A protein has these predicted regions:
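A short helix->loop->beta-strand "cap" motif at the edges of active sites that frequently abuts
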Residues: 88-98, 139
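Catalytic His-Asp segment of secreted/periplasmic serine-dependent ester chemistry enzymes
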Residues: 110, 115-189
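Hydrophobic/aromatic beta-strand patches that form the interior of the parallel beta-sheet core
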Residues: 29, 64, 98, 140-142
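A generic structural signal for well-ordered alpha-helical segments
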Residues: 21-24, 90, 134
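Serine-dependent acyl-ester chemistry module
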Residues: 62, 68-74, 105-124
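Conserved SGNH/GDSL esterase-like catalytic core that processes O-acyl groups on lipids
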Residues: 2-6, 10-84
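Structural beta-sheet core signal
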Residues: 5, 99-101
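Alpha-helical scaffolding segments of alpha/beta enzyme cores, especially the outer helices
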Residues: 78-88, 92, 121, 125-132
Length: 189
């Protein structure tokens, strides 16, 4: 199985790609940059876009899409359009697109306060945007953000000190959820 992951630091923190490869016995390749938005993967004038263009010439089984942390809420139109276009490209190279739905910033953090949203409100807004994008792009969804919300009492393990990047436990949880979605899809054919 070959998996391509497109995203940013939420995808490369703690070598999430390697965690996913171990869980699935798959070849996992990532095309990432800290702070990147999915729209950069579509722009051949950027390094990410040029790399993505080459990567989409290969055959893949799954393409995992992860948007900048608050992008699905604050740049919703761009997010939806990027998912639509990247999902189409994924299918053209034989892959199923899968959205890695991320989480709200840590409850009570300054980072969360800077959004003007509460923890539950940001969690729900991200959930809604990712699921709307999944409908538009015909994507599978790995609801990692929902799991972070349900496990918020373990915030010290889910997050590192900056209150938004995942700790090793958080990345492991993400790998488990993405792997479970892929296994279920393979099982259901």
């Amino acid at each position: 199985m070959k998996i391509l992951m497109l995203g940013n630091s939420f995808t490369y923190c703690n070598d999430l790609d390697k965690m996913l490869a171990e869980r699935l016995g798959a070849c996992v390749v990532r095309n990432v940059r800290g702070g990147a938005r999915l729209s950069e993967q579509l722009n051949p004038a950027t390094e990410l876009g040029a790399n993505a263009k080459k990567l989409f010439e290969e055959k893949w089984d799954y393409v995992v899409l992860q948007e900048m942390s608050r992008g699905p809420v604050t740049e919703k139109e761009s997010f939806m359009q990027s998912v639509k276009e990247l999902s189409s490209r994924a299918r053209e190279c034989g892959a199923k697109p899968l959205l890695y739905a991320t989480w709200a910033y840590r409850e009570g953090s300054e980072k969360l306060a800077s959004t003007g949203l509460g923890y539950k409100e940001m969690t729900q807004a991200l959930h809604d945007s990712y699921h709307e994008a999944a409908q538009i792009g015909g994507c599978l969804v790995a609801d990692v953000g929902d799991a972070f919300y349900e496990m918020r009492e373990k915030a010290d393990e889910l997050f590192v000190e900056d209150d938004y990047h995942p700790g090793v436990y958080g990345s492991g949880l993400a790998a488990d959820i993405i792997a479970a979605v892929i296994r279920e899809d393979v099982k259901n054919g």
